[in-house]
């Protein structure tokens, strides 16, 4: 358990650092008009999650805590969201997958807006 926790912590630090560098680099290249860095991180993270799911299924998942939960979790949680949605779809639960995607996005946006409204009201 401690070994897995350390793997997740180290991977998370590396993933978060990679996310930060990607965002800083994209801001310098493309400017702040569109969140290119976040889009890059989400697409690349989802691609890498797809690669790791297949590779680790064949090679063993000894490094899954470091690579999947740690590095990709620190890099982007969108990769885990994408994996969950595709897993539901591949299990033949397309309706549940669609509901998961819709609810996740909708409720996350609502949660963000509620948090912002709560703090703005408190700080006013």
Swiss-Prot record:
Keywords per UniProt: Cell inner membrane, Cell membrane, Ion channel, Ion transport, Membrane, Metal-binding, Sodium, Transmembrane, Transmembrane helix, Transport
Catalytic reaction list: fluoride(in) = fluoride(out)
Location(s), subcellular: Cell inner membrane
GO cellular component, one term: plasma membrane
Binding site for Na(+): 73, 76
Segments passing through the bilayer: 36-56, 63-83, 99-119
One BP term from GO: cellular detoxification of fluoride
Activity regulation description: Na(+) is not transported, but it plays an essential structural role and its presence is essential for fluoride channel function.
Membrane topology per record: Multi-pass membrane protein
Pfam families given in the database record: CRCB (PF02537)
GO molecular function: fluoride channel activity; metal ion binding
PANTHER family cross-referenced by the UniProt entry: FLUORIDE EXPORT PROTEIN 1-RELATED
Family: Belongs to the fluoride channel Fluc/FEX (TC 1.A.43) family.
Function, as annotated: Fluoride-specific ion channel. Important for reducing fluoride concentration in the cell, thus reducing its toxicity.
The protein's name: Fluoride-specific ion channel FluC
Organism: Cereibacter sphaeroides (strain ATCC 17023 / DSM 158 / JCM 6121 / CCUG 31486 / LMG 2827 / NBRC 12203 / NCIMB 8253 / ATH 2.4.1.) (Rhodobacter sphaeroides)
């Amino acid at each position: 358990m401690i070994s897995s926790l350390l793997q997740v912590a180290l991977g998370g630090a590396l993933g978060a650092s990679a996310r930060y560098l990607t965002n800083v680099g994209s801001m310098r290249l493309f400017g702040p008009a569109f969140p290119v860095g976040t889009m890059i991180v989400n697409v690349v993270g989802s691609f890498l999650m797809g690669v790791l799911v297949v590779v680790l299924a064949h090679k063993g998942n000894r490094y899954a805590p470091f690579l999947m939960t740690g590095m990709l979790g620190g890099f982007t949680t969108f990769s885990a969201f994408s994996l969950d949605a595709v897993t539901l779809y591949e299990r033949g639960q397309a309706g549940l997958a669609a509901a998961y995607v819709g609810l996740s996005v909708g409720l996350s946006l609502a949660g963000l807006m509620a948090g912002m409204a709560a703090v703005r009201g408190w700080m006013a």
